[in-house]
Structure formats: structure tokens, C-alpha cells
């Protein structure tokens, strides 16, 4: 387990075609995976992602802008534990003889956050997403409707409002417009837009945020703070 990667561990496994469990190493840190990314290596198939806010009956595909799919074939309708995660019989996660890689993520307080938020459709008073750290990397996706994945970082330019992003499910170049640019603070971020990709009224969004190197007495660099 590497704290520098927000607490993630990687595993290769062979599919059996029957539901079962895969051991992970995050339990050594007392952690339960909140996000799992699975990809078949030996044959063309979709990326398959578990996110605990979406639940153990659903999955999101990394290579698509689709909303969630439902079925026991993905996670066997079972949430991860501190020692294993479950898989069903879908070819995306468990075809007999298939070769797979799984990347499991959990949280470290003050450094990473895996959670969700609900949009309010307001650009003047958007939702503030509390992460407990200053985000350096944010992966997000609307999961209740079709829309693109989006990755934001605060290093390309490094100041508000120029935290540009990319679409991991597309081959587009970096987006440098002003519609999808968040404001990053020492304890979270806001999405000052009404665009449904990030802030539809009532829209359901999942995200994973990773912070910068822990520094200071409170382990959070303070460059700006959101007071609401």
C-alpha cells in the first residue's frame, strides 16, 4: 500500500467464470476499498468501476460516458470488506481463464477522499465539496445520467480559475474553456457552472480527490479556505 498514491493497491487475477472473492492488501492499513477499477488484459472488454456511493449492484465504465449499469455479474451484489472484494460472472470482471488487473483505492484522512455530491444547478452558489485536503487531482463522473468523465489537476496552470482538465474516455486535447473549471481551496473545491456534466440540479456525481504532499502542523497546506 502506498500513501503517495492515495492508498491504492494493484492485483492481477485469473477469472473463473463463477462468482467469488479476490483478496486485497488494503486491510493492513485497516481500510476497505471505496473505489475499484478492473480491466481485462487478454481480450477486448470494458473497464469496470465500483464506487461505494453507487453501490454494490452497479458499475460505471471508464471507457464510456454512459450512466451506471446494474447487475449481480459485476460485484455479486456484495460490498468489499477489509480483506476481499467480490466479483460476479460478467466478462468485464470474471470470464473463465481471463486475465485481469484490479486497482483498489481507499481514503487517507487529510490526503484523499472518495465520495459523491449532488448538484444544485447554480453557478453563483454552487455546492462546496469538502475533501479535507487541497486537491491536486480530481477524477469525477455523473453517474445518474450519460455524461463524460473528467480529470482536473492544479499543476498544469496552478491557480484559480485555470485548473484545466481532460476527458479520460475521449482522445480530446486538454479542455481550456471556462465552463468546466473548478475553484480549488485548501479543504475542497467548488464547480462554478450550471453545465450538467458537473452541476445539474439534482444530478448525482461521484469523485475521487487526491491531495498534495502533506505539510504543516495540520497536514493541510493553507493557501485559501472556503467558509461557505
Give short role names for the model-derived ranges.
Residues 93-107, 198-215:
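Extended Gly/Ser/Thr-rich low-complexity repeat segments
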Residues 51-98, 153-201:
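Contiguous ligand/interfacial binding patches
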Residues 1-7:
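Short, small-residue-biased leader/transition segments that mark boundaries at the very start
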Residues 40-45, 54-57, 67, 108-110, ...:
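Acidic glycine-/aspartate-rich tracts in secreted/extracellular proteins
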Residues 12-30, 89-94, 116-132, 197:
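Surface-exposed ligand/attachment interfaces on beta-rich extracellular proteins
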Residues 8-52, 103, 130, 214-228:
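GGW-centered surface loops in extracellular recognition modules
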Residues 26-43, 127-156, 209:
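Beta-rich globular "head" domains
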Residues 130-145, 183-212:
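Extracellular low-complexity, Gly/Ser/Thr-rich intrinsically disordered linkers
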Amino acid at each position: 500500500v502506498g500513501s503517495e498514491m492515495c492508498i491504492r493497491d494493484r492485483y492481477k487475477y485469473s477469472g473463473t467464470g463463477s462468482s467469488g472473492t479476490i483478496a486485497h492488501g488494503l486491510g493492513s492499513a485497516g481500510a476497505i476499498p471505496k473505489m475499484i477499477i478492473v480491466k481485462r488484459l487478454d481480450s477486448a472488454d470494458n473497464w469496470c468501476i465500483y464506487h461505494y456511493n453507487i453501490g454494490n449492484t452497479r458499475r460505471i465504465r471508464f471507457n464510456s460516458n454512459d450512466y451506471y449499469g446494474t447487475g449481480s455479474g459485476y460485484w455479486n451484489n456484495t460490498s468489499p470488506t477489509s480483506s476481499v472484494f467480490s466479483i460476479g460472472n460478467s466478462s468485464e470482471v470474471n470470464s473463465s481463464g481471463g486475465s485481469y488487473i484490479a486497482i483498489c483505492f481507499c481514503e487517507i484522512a487529510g490526503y484523499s477522499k472518495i465520495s459523491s455530491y449532488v448538484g444544485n444547478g447554480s453557478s453563483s452558489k454552487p455546492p462546496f465539496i469538502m475533501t479535507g485536503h487541497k486537491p491536486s487531482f480530481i477524477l469525477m463522473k455523473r453517474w445518474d445520467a450519460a455524461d463524460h468523465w473528467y480529470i482536473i489537476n492544479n499543476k498544469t496552470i496552478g491557480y484559480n480559475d485555470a485548473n484545466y482538465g481532460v476527458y479520460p474516455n475521449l482522445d480530446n486535447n486538454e479542455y481550456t474553456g471556462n465552463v468546466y473549471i473548478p475553484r480549488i481551496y485548501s479543504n475542497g473545491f467548488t464547480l462554478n457552472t450550471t453545465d450538467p456534466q458537473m452541476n445539474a440540479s439534482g444530478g448525482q456525481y461521484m469523485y475521487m480527490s487526491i491531495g498534495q504532499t502533506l505539510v504543516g502542523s495540520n497536514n493541510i497546506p493553507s493557501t485559501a479556505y472556503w467558509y461557505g
